[in-house]
Regions:
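Flavin-dependent oxidoreductase catalytic cores
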Residues: 1-408, 412, 416-428, 436, ...
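Receiver (REC) domain switch-region micro-motif
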Residues: 57, 273, 336, 490, ...
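Active-site acidic short loop of glycosyltransferases
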Residues: 221-222, 309-310, 487, 524, ...
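Flexible, Lys/Arg-rich cytosolic regulatory linkers and terminal tails that connect or flank
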Residues: 370-386, 565, 582, 650-653, ...
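Rossmann-like dinucleotide/flavin-binding elements
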Residues: 399, 403-431, 472-484, 493-566, ...
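Rossmann-like dinucleotide-binding cores of NAD(P)H-dependent redox enzymes
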Residues: 427-467, 540-592
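Feature captures the FAD/FMN-dependent oxidoreductase FAD-binding
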Residues: 458-497, 593-599
Length: 666
């Protein structure tokens, strides 16, 4: 075993885990039924991660209160809404999870308060400790009364008791973290109260103290109660967070207060601290995109571990196995929490234990299948794993007649199609025009912050080789040649072509793909990127941060990232701030007029004024057009499908999901 330290037991209170891996809690939208119980998708979703070897499953957020922070119906499981139903559905899940030797904690929330996503509110106003601005709305929150606080505390006791009856091994309180309701009470920036719940740190933590005391009173002193805890908020101001490496005055909880709070919370009776960093006002810390470094919470977890004597859990892009074992060995944490990596691959832990790290499907940090879908009031899923939270409904369909399927294009959509077809028992054959797999994602993976894109390509290459999929490289199939081949089904995954236009003197004009394909060697010291969408912004960030270029973005719309394929807010808000932070000159409401020998002439769309800016290289990042030529030429085929960017230029999530859907029903 390569990582034995990660497979030793550890206890939270008197509950022993079989290894050092926990499933980090993630919003369980779509996993509850109308009575507040776990639906079949939720039961299958958590059980699959236990089957995959995870020692402790921590559910996503559930509620116990259903009267104070009112919502139109339970959008997440609720342990008091219909107690008998909750116990029945919960017990079905806990019994299945225990069959795999895993433990399970129910994460219980005190409420969202000012950070409630508007689609969850319905007609009800957000609540908070004080009349403060909400995260998303231009309104003022309603301050909770003391009686309402007491009612929420009492509901925790009842809800935890129902969880214990349902077979849960413990609970985790949500949370003195990320700026949720209990955290809003704990942070003076949000809490302006003058009663016993405001003022001193002890008073601001009173809500959290009363919750653990109520649960211990109701469920017994030995019933474990963990706490999700952010020792630092990373808040610059209302709705404005700090970037990595940025100097700023912390308006939320700073580390000094975080360490003091940790000691107090343990003295109140909490049995473990599940550490992260950030808040909804700095969402890219709480839900780190690919622009954040791996293991970004480690130094904060280590600081907490040095002042408490209970187990410390640490999440935050901990899907580097060597980093994880080092964290346990060096006292950074006791337990490694994996959230999105377990969405991407529920068998992560078992594969790691068996030394099959190349088999682990990587999370790419896009957050479009998980946080992005939750924000849109959909359900938690995964961009690279279409079966996530749909394990039963999207199981591989059996094959009754083996088919030979020709796949034109070895990009991500083509690879996913071949993978699913081969697993089901069909005979896929890939024809790829270049000498490698990955399609456009290969160039997209050039920047240092997109390493996981390349990791996904490597995983597909490894997986297709194991499955014995036939691949023809450097073979550009034409319609004429296709008509001479024998096959049952044709899949066209020929991608998309970059849009271009002439700027007059085009000698120094290239596309974003050209720049990435040559690792920036064809880009001069001064570069102008035309287009402020995700491609243009990531290109500018790479050119400045990684290559030290001087970059200007020219964007016709009023802001960066105004038109894109869907992007999770944590990703888009961080990227929008990183671009100028690393020195890019952003020119919105501006258009390119012409390229000259000395640079690029641009025009202000509001004033009409023109100016010339330095440009050794002009890079077009103005979108893509699906390449449907081959698909259109093959319409006489009995069974032909267009997938990926060939169908519609979108993102990895759409490419993988469309490919899975088509391949699973051939």
């Amino acid at each position: 075993m390569k990582y034995p330290e990660l497979f030793t037991p550890i206890s939270i209170g008197k509950v022993q885990m079989k290894n050092r891996f926990a499933m980090a809690p993630m919003g369980p939208l779509g996993l509850a039924d109308a009575q507040g119980g776990f639906n079949q998708r939720g039961i299958d979703y958590y059980t699959e991660r236990a089957k995959g070897g995870t020692g402790l499953i921590i559910t996503g957020v559930t509620f116990s209160d259903c009267t104070v922070e009112m919502q139109s119906m339970p959008n997440c499981p609720n342990s008091t809404y219909n107690p008998v139903h909750f116990v029945r559905t919960g017990r079905e899940m806990t019994e299945r999870i225990h069959a795999y030797g895993s433990k399970i904690f129910l994460q219980m929330s005190g409420g969202f308060g000012r950070v409630t996503i508007p689609t969850n509110l319905g007609e009800f106003p957000p609540v908070a400790p004080s009349p403060i601005p909400p995260r998303w709305l231009d309104k003022t929150c309603r301050a909770l009364t003391v009686d309402e606080i007491h009612a929420i505390v009492e509901s925790f006791g009842k809800g935890a008791y129902n969880a214990k009856r349902a077979g849960f091994d413990g609970v985790e309180i949500h949370a003195v973290h990320e700026g949720y309701l209990i955290d809003q009470f704990a942070i003076s920036f949000f809490n302006h109260r003058t009663d016993e719940y405001g003022g001193s740190l002890e008073n601001r933590l009173r809500f959290a103290r009363e919750i653990v005391e109520e649960i211990k009173k109701t469920c017994g002193a030995d019933f474990p109660v963990a706490l999700r805890f952010s020792p630092k908020s990373m808040i610059k101001d209302w709705r404005e967070g700090a970037l990595p490496g940025e100097e700023f005055a912390e308006k939320g909880r700073d580390m000094e207060e975080g360490l003091e709070a940790a000691k107090l919370l343990i003295s109140y009776g909490y049995d473990a601290l599940d550490v992260d960093v950030g808040s909804y006002d700095s969402w890219w810390w709480s839900h780190p995109p690919m622009y954040q470094k791996k293991g970004l919470y480690r130094k904060y977890a280590k600081a907490i571990k040095e002042v408490v004597d209970v187990p410390v859990l640490c999440a935050g892009r901990m899907d580097d196995s060597d980093m994880a074992v080092e964290a346990v060995q060096t006292g950074v944490c006791d337990i490694v929490s994996l959230g999105r990596p377990l969405l991407a691959d529920p068998d992560y832990v078992n594969k790691l234990r068996a030394g099959k790290t190349a088999d682990i499907r990587p999370c790419i940090g896009c957050q479009e299948g998980c946080m992005g879908r939750i924000q849109k009031y959909s359900m938690i899923n995964c961009a690279v794993n279409p079966q996530c939270a749909r394990e039963r409904a999207f199981a591989y369909n059996p094959v009754f007649r083996k088919k030979k399927v020709v796949i034109v294009g070895g990009g991500i959509a083509g690879c996913e199609t071949a993978r699913v077809l081969a697993i089901r028992g069909h005979e896929p054959v890939i024809y790829e025009a270049s000498d490698r797999l990955g399609g456009a994602l290969y160039e997209a993976g050039v920047p240092s912050f997109k390493d996981d894109d390349r990791a996904l390509i490597a995983w597909y290459a490894h997986t297709l080789e194991k499955l014995g999929v036939e691949i023809h490289f450097n073979h550009r199939l034409t319609a004429g040649e296709l008509k001479t081949l024998s096959f049952d089904t044709l899949i066209v995954a020929t991608g998309a072509k970059a849009k271009t236009f002439s700027l007059g003197d085009d000698r120094r004009v290239i596309t974003a793909k050209d720049a990435l394909a040559q690792s920036g060697e064809n880009v001069g010291k001064h570069a102008v990127v035309i287009g402020g969408g995700m491609v243009g912004c990531e290109l500018a960030l790479w050119l400045t941060k990684d290559l030290g270029k001087k970059v200007t973005i020219v964007e016709a719309l009023p802001k960066l990232l105004a038109v894109n394929a869907p992007i999770c807010s944590a990703n888009s808000e961080m990227l929008e701030r990183l671009v100028p932070f690393y020195g890019t000159d952003v020119r919105c409401r501006t258009t390119a007029v012409k390229a000259t020998e000395n640079g690029l002439v641009i025009r202000d769309l509001d004033t009409g004024a023109e100016e010339s800016i330095p440009a050794d290289t002009v890079i077009l990042a103005v979108g893509f057009t699906p390449d449907r030529e081959l698909y259109n030429a093959m319409q006489e085929c009995d069974e032909v499908y267009a997938i990926g960017d060939c169908k519609e230029f979108h993102n990895v999530h759409s490419a993988v999901w469309d490919a899975f859907e088509v391949a699973n029903h051939i």
